[in-house]
Amino acid sequence: MTNGLNVREMALEILLEVEKNGAYPNVLLKQTLDKYLYMEKQERAFLTRLVEGTVERKLTLEYYVNKVSKTPVGKMKPVIRCIMRMAVYQIFFMDSVPDSAACNEAVKLAQKKGFHTLKGFVNGVLRNLSRQKESIVLPDEEKEPVKALSVQYSVPEWLVEKISKDYGVEAAKNMFASLYENVGSITIRVNNSKISTEECTELLKKEGVQVEKAVYVENALEISGYDSLAFLESFQKGYFQVQDVSSMLVGLAAAPTAGAQIIDICAAPGGKSIHVADLLNGTGHVEARDLTDYKVGLIEENISRCGFSNITAKRMDACVLDEQSRESADVVIADLPCSGLGVLKKKSDIKYRMSQSQIEELVELQRTILKNAVNYVKTGGTLVYSTCTVAKEENDQQVDWILEHLPLKLVSLKDCISEELLKNTDREGCLQLLPGREKTDGFFLAKFQKI
């Protein structure tokens, strides 16, 4: 163990920030890992799994605690609540951790945080759970289908009902189950204007990275087994970009021709913009826009690392019409702010933050941005609309609104997206991906031509 570091205490600090201040666990986790780069690989993996697992399984963990505790989780002090969830996650979902260690370390943390009088309570609840873990029964799926799926997959009941209504119970179950599959690998897109996919694969293997061919996109790879991307020469040289396969489809749908002028209106962290810059192979120009200096900084970091000269980043509010950009773009990419219900595997806290009323607000925001974005497209040019959600209000129903209110028509995706992906979407020009059905994030895109 690295001297002076208590990994469980580090996890607790992250989870407390999430609990008390609504912080984003993925952001805090990255900041912590970046700060303590000297941590051993095993410790980094333990911290990551403990934080991510405790967040993604929160409702399940609370169900277990409430089965044996006289004090409901909701009435516990935030520190104790977080300690309990962490310990229960280790007991139920981390086979490598002895139950006794999970209990003892939780008691030590409670004491260290000043809750000496509650150490007996913490110890009693956790040891009871350890003894009873094989006999605790989850809600019956036939009698209480919504509650059963909610507890089993740690998804709020309103969201279980919504997804089940929109796509059917079986698709909902597959979607929720997929949140816990194939954890630990990430998908990358090789920048083929810099290196071939085969050369990049060999280089990654020489760097000790496990590499698999990803599905649906030729230059997509799945990688795992590395310590930190920042240490990889192939990453430093900009040979690849971290990007889910679903997100890569936006660049393929945009299908830019040599010399094209492209505007990506909500671009951070820049994956789609860099993809189309790569497809342009040094020609044309991509303007990658976003709202804040921080987001523009993220785009600029990736541009600098990848070394492309045909792309620039610019701070701009997509809700405000940019008169100077009227009829200036051959392609506009509108990957807009959305509910994020397709990326719960990567950002599991979204399912606890989101609500139906927020979805409705996002629909209005998307329409405001789209009314501006259509002005930037040349007549006959392309607008690609995309979201990382499965909410129909933001996807299919938003397309209905676009066709009724904007000078756009849907155009076929058959020349740029594989038949295998298109077979599950009935509407020409649209693509809806579902986790558990396709091997991707949940994602939607629609390709339009300006008329």
Placement of each model-derived feature along the sequence:
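S-adenosylmethionine
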Residues: 1-451
